[in-house]
Amino acid sequence: MKLYRAKDYKDMSRKAANVISAQVIMKPDCVLGLATGSSPLGTYQQLIEWYEKGDLDFSETKSANLDEYKGLPRDNDQSYYYFMYNNFFKHINIDLNNTNIPNGMEPDSAKECARYEKVIADLGGVDLQLLGLGHNGHIGFNEPDAAFEKITHCVDLTESTIEANKRFFATIDDVPKQAYTMGIGTIMRAKKILLIVSGEEKSSILYKALYGPVTPQVPASILQLHNDVVVVADEAALSKFPG
Ligand code: F6R
């Protein structure tokens, strides 16, 4: 595991974007595993800037996102498709036919999860998987649990997640109660993993993930067993590390 120390969020985003551009330059038709959330926003902005300058070409690049809410159509502004389209895809020259996100509108969970696993397998697997880190150590929607869920599956969102999300919806009944997510095994099959972490509030969980016991109670701790992980964390995220 390589740990790169960044000064702040902007520096983290720039360093992460460097790792992703190196991948795209070395293998233009690579498969990028992508994430949503606040952590990768700056990384996407940096990649867009370099694309606009003519330094990057995504015309052959393919992508597979980690997760999507079940029950939200693509045009709902809370869907992960909407996030990816508006924060990244529409600004670069990636072919939308080469982008993949679980289909939140497929009601049959078993069918959708099997389809998505096959999509990734047919792509030849993910070359570089970008991950953010949840406050409880989750990656994708793989929450702390008694066991690692291996493949793409449907998760029931916790009451606290539903409660936290309700501000984005008209009523609590509109808040999605489930999501589709790549499993821990799906994530671990990526050839390379890039974990980006910013902010003091994630410092303790980052330390546990990188140096604590490997346990499904801290899903990101499984990354210790992957042989090609790059972590880019800012000083705040490293601030509670002992020593
Ligand atoms: C997003 C995802 C989540 C986030 C995590 C961190 O697709 O799968 O695991 O990466 O919740 O979120 P932020 O970056 O918003 O702190």
Pin down the residues of each PLM region.
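Conserved phosphate- and dinucleotide-binding cores of soluble alpha/beta proteins
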Residues: 4, 72-78, 82-86, 90-243
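N-terminal active-site beta-alpha-beta segment that forms phosphate/nucleotide-binding
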Residues: 2-115, 119-122
